[in-house]
């Protein structure tokens, strides 16, 4: 969550025209450290010893350990227009252009229009943050000697500079602005005043910068506190932060007020909170605020809570059908409630046992006023209702309340009731958490092994830095400032797990990968807690430790016991290292206690993953094997992920075979069918989304089992939405919710692709599926048909198909003329507003398409080229197979694909997917548009009148597949991998080189049919955790 302190009355003194940026830290050193050195917290106790593990101790500054470039940084929209630009930015030569663009545009301080008052080098940015944190640590007495403090600064700087780790965005936004540049601003937040031993509001908020993005707030069952929460949420949204609250404390609408009246219930106040979030845009931006609202399953209003979002979605759909703007930020959605929050139901073990036994579940009153029994529900039916609503709109998710509190380190101070918006931070009410993430790929060695010793050293360094920030940061409310000091929760995590797994030659969906994930997470959590105990020996435990000592030690023992359950198929040395580490954690923890009540979470690491040039975020697998790399001089280059090459090398392939496989992936966007690749290794390269020319992807169950491998080794939870394909059923979602509880997860959120605009489809019977499979397996004898590049005109009298469409209220008609065998050969496009500009353009577009089809341009080329083209008018349609069209051209192309091509990658229809076995469109075709979807209703109708002609075109299509494509090994489905027999791909290569930005947009639009455009640059986003991430500008629509 982007967190920015107010800019009013802010002044700065950034060093202008510095002639020697390479000496940005030359004024510091051991002598300077001696001046800053203090023992404020530790008194007579010895401080931390710190040995350099990363930055060479050879007299050079950390910034002299890398080469530097001068580059321009720019953020452009999909049309190439610059939204942000800064020239002559100094960045490490090893950083990608995307990392440069993200860091310069988001994290450099100052006015972009005044470069003399703006940071212009990455070394300024990193030095501002790491020097400030180190100085604070020196002054507070964390380090044993000034030399230890200076070594800490050097290592922390080196790790940040070389992309080994990164703090969450608020740290880069705010830390060091006062200490390094004397920036000042108005009083607003709260901090802990160590001198007075209480909370206070600083005169200058930049002196105590806000460093956290994750907040949890409480609410009591009275009007004053309910409105107080509304006010504090508004202030959090103003500063760009996200917040979560459990509303189970608010009495049900079925209960009584103290004066005898009828209460409103939590849902009524949710409408108030939702309205505030919709009006106060997050961080002053146009995106919606990030918030989480939960309700415990035993609350009497639980059914209304479960159904509330879907009930409002149906209103939006009705408005859209009447012509209102269908954009997610448009009039239709703006006029309905509950669109600004994630919703979660808190499930208890007794409820889940009732589901297992198919028993009734009794809710309970919040107060003792009622004399009647509260509502009772069949537990399984209630779970099915959650799944049904999540199937429709993605909410509610679930949080497993009993499991969460079973792993709670501070139960004597209160229960864990809520989470932050992304569900990874779960702790006491009115607390905050600052996050940091380690880039796992930086610790993979040349031989493919993982350097767990250096990984632990990096974890220790960042954890110390996070701890130093706690009392030097400010917080949006007084209770949060007080509790942050009292409990000091931190959230260290990691990123790039998916890349590490692929590099190791392991499928993401494998016991070996889950074993590796468990071991790495155990090492992360173990080192964080070991460091916390080490800090306790120096500066003391957190204030709430004494009353929670026994439960905290019990939880630590649970973590150690879980080490023995790590899957043995993973790397044995990592599992053994985790066991030994946790033995040490228990020993030092029992002796000194712990400095921090919580230590780790797994956040989605959106924007900071780009800063570290990570291929994958958080615990996620890779989204695709092919990426689009931004070039320093502008434009984009299509590249195959380096992890593919590393994975192939680990699997033992020789250099020539690897080169052939990489060429194939580059040409085809998929590794399926690559020459020389063994079938048993295909799963290693499976990604989160199916490639355009492939059929494989990681199943949703694998995402849940990977979460289960990591969960026992985290203080908090995992921010990860389990993405499901369009054709899953509500029962699949209910099964996932129950399975997550059985596996010991703390939370799970489901998002079904297309759920924002799709309706339920009846699944086929087993008999019908068997019939379809048998039909697909039929292979006819074919004859050789030779097509020449000539114009094939339609007969004077021909059949045609007329289709009426409506896009966001703009009506039009498509009339497609057909050859005798059912192929489309011409198209007339008529818009309702005759004579309009768009009408003329569409008429010309129809003529161009007609000529193209008659001269033999394959239909799938036309469909692939024009699908997902984005411009106005766009929005909801009346076609159940194409719920949202990104333009009229997009609608026409996808309608052609659905109607005349086999497969239906162009709509979210589960029925169509079942008809083709889920394998997508057949990408091989005869010339002159010979491909036709002979299973479609249109072709079925035509087949009655032209059976012989249709049989001919079926044979021609199959022949073209055999002649022009290389079989993918499945003789029963007729799909080729799209590789030309002659190996000619020059045209495709040229297209990739000149249309990189369009290619990336097309690639991402295929991942999820209803992914929104970025609110910053307009590019299509990809779902990341509970929010969306833009791979063009690095914007995270909800999380840091």
UniProtKB/Swiss-Prot annotation:
NCBIfam families: NrdJ_Z, PRK06556.1. Catalyzes the reduction of ribonucleotides to deoxyribonucleotides. May function to provide a pool of deoxyribonucleotide precursors for DNA repair during oxygen limitation and/or for immediate growth after restoration of oxygen. The active site is at residues 420, 422, 424. Disulfide bonds join 214-433. Its EC number is 1.17.4.1. The gene is nrdJ. SUPFAM superfamilies: PFL-like glycyl radical enzymes. InterPro entries: RdRp_reductase_class-2, RNR_2_N, RNR_lg_C, RNR_NrdJ/NrdZ, TSCPD_dom. This is Vitamin B12-dependent ribonucleotide reductase. It comes from Rhodopirellula baltica (strain DSM 10527 / NCIMB 13988 / SH1). Residues 969-979 have a biased composition (Polar residues). One of its GO terms (biological process) is DNA biosynthetic process. 5'-deoxyadenosylcobalamine (coenzyme B12). It is an enzyme of class 1 (oxidoreductase). Substrate binds at residues 169, 213-214, 242, 420-424, 604-608.
């Amino acid at each position: 969550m982007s967190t920015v302190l107010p800019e009013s009355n802010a002044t700065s003194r950034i060093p202008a025209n510095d002639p020697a940026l390479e000496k940005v830290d030359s004024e510091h050193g051991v002598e300077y450290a001696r001046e800053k050195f203090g023992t404020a917290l530790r008194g007579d106790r010895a401080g931390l010893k710190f040995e350099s593990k990363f930055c060479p101790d050879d007299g050079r500054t950390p910034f002299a350990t890398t080469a530097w470039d001068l580059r321009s940084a720019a953020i452009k929209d999909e049309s190439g227009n610059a939204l942000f630009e800064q020239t002559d930015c100094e960045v490490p030569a090893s950083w990608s252009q995307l990392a440069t663009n993200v860091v310069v545009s988001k994290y450099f301080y100052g006015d972009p229009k005044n470069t003399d008052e703006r940071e212009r080098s990455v070394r300024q940015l990193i030095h501002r943050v790491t020097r400030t944190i180190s100085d604070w640590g020196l002054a507070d007495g964390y380090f044993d000697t000034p030399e230890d403090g200076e070594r800490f600064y050097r290592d922390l700087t080196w790790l940040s500079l070389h992309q080994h780790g990164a703090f969450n965005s608020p740290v880069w936004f705010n830390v060091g602005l006062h200490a390094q540049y004397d920036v000042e601003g108005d009083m607003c937040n709260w901090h802990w005043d160590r001198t007075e031993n209480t909370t206070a509001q600083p005169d200058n908020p930049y002196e105590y910068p806000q460093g956290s993005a994750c907040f949890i707030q409480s609410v009591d069952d009275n009007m004053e506190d309910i409105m107080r929460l509304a006010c504090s949420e508004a202030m959090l949204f103003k500063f760009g932060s996200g917040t979560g609250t459990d509303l189970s404390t608010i009495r049900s609408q079925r209960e009584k007020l103290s004066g005898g009246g009828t209460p409103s219930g939590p849902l009524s106040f949710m409408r108030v909170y939702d309205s505030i979030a919709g009006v106060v845009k997050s961080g002053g931006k146009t995106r919606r605020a990030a918030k989480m609202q939960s309700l415990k399953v035993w609350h009497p209003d639980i059914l209304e809570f479960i159904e509330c979002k879907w009930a409002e979605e149906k209103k939006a759909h009705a408005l859209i059908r009447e012509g209102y703007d269908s954009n997610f930020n448009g009039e239709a959605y703006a006029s309905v409630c509950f669109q600004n929050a994630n919703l979660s139901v808190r499930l208890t073990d007794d409820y889940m046992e009732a589901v297992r036994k198919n028993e009734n579940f009794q809710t309970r009153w919040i107060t003792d006023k009622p004399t009647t029994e509260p509502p009772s529900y069949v537990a399984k039916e209630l779970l099915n209702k959650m799944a049904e609503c999540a199937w429709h709109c993605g909410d509610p998710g679930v949080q497993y309340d009993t499991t969460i509190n079973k792993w709670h380190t501070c139960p004597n101070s209160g229960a864990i009731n809520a989470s932050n918006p992304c569900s990874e931070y779960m702790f006491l009410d009115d607390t905050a958490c600052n996050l940091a993430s380690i880039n796992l790929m930086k610790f993979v060695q040349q031989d493919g092994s993982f350097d767990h010793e250096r990984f632990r050293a990096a974890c220790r360094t960042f954890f110390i830095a996070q701890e130093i920030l706690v009392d030097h940061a400010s917080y949006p409310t007084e209770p949060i400032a007080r509790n942050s000091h009292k409990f000091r929760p931190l959230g260290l995590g990691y990123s790039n797990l998916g890349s590490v797994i692929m590099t190791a030659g392991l499928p993401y969906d494998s016991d070996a990968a889950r074993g590796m994930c468990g071991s790495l997470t155990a090492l992360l959590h173990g080192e964080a807690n070991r460091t916390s105990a080490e800090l306790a020996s120096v500066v003391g435990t957190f204030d709430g430790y004494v009353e929670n000592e026994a439960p905290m030690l019990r939880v630590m023992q649970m973590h150690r016991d879980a080490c023995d359950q790590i899957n043995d198929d993973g790397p044995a040395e990592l599992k053994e290292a985790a066991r030994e580490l946790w033995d040490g954690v228990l020993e030092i923890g029992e002796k000194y206690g712990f400095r921090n009540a919580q230590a780790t979470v797994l956040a989605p690491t959106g924007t900071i993953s780009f800063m570290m040039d990570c291929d994958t975020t958080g615990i996620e697998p890779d989204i695709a094997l092919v990426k689009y790399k931004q070039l320093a001089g502008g434009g984009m280059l299509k590249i195959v992920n380096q992890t593919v090459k590393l994975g192939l090398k680990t699997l033992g392939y020789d250099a020539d075979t690897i080169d052939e496989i990489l060429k194939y992936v580059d040409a085809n966007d998929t590794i399926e069918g690559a020459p020389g690749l063994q079938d048993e290794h295909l799963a290693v390269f499976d990604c989160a989304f199916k490639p355009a020319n492939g059929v494989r992807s990681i199943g949703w169950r694998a995402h849940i089992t990977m979460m289960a491998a990591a969960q026992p080794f985290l203080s908090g939870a995992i921010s990860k939405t389990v993405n499901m394909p369009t054709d899953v059923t509500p029962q699949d979602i209910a099964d996932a919710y129950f399975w997550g509880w059985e596996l010991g997860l703390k939370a799970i959120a489901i998002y079904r692709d297309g759920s924002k605009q799709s309706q339920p489809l009846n699944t086929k019977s087993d008999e019908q599926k068997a019939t379809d499979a048998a039909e697909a397996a039929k292979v006819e004898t074919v004859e050789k048909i030779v097509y020449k590049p000539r114009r094939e005109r339609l007969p004077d009298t021909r059949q045609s198909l007329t289709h009426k469409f409506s896009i966001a209220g703009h009506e039009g008609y498509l009339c497609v003329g057909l050859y005798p065998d059912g192929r489309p050969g011409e198209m007339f496009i008529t818009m309702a507003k005759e004579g309009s500009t768009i009408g003329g353009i569409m008429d010309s577009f129809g003529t161009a398409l007609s000529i193209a089809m008659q001269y033999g341009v394959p239909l799938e080329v036309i469909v692939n080229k024009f699908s997902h083209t984005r411009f106005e008018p766009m929005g909801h349609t009346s076609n159940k197979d194409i719920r949202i069209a990104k333009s009229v051209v997009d609608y026409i192309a996808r309608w052609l694909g659905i109607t005349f091509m086999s497969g239906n990658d162009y709509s979210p229809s589960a029925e169509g997917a079942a008809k083709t076995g889920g394998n997508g469109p057949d990408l091989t075709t005869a010339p002159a548009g010979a491909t036709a979807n002979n299973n479609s209703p249109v072709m079925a109708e035509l087949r009655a009148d032209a059976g012989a002609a249709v049989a001919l075109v079926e044979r021609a299509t199959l022949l073209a597949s055999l002649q022009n494509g290389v079989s993918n090994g499945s003789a029963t489905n007729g799909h080729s991998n799209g590789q030309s027999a002659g190996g000619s791909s020059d045209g495709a290569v040229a297209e990739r080189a000149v249309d990189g930005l369009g290619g990336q947009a097309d690639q991402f639009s295929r991942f999820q049919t209803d992914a929104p455009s970025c609110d910053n640059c307009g590019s299509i986003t990809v779902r990341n955790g509970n929010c969306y991430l833009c791979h063009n500008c690095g914007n995270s629509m909800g999380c840091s």
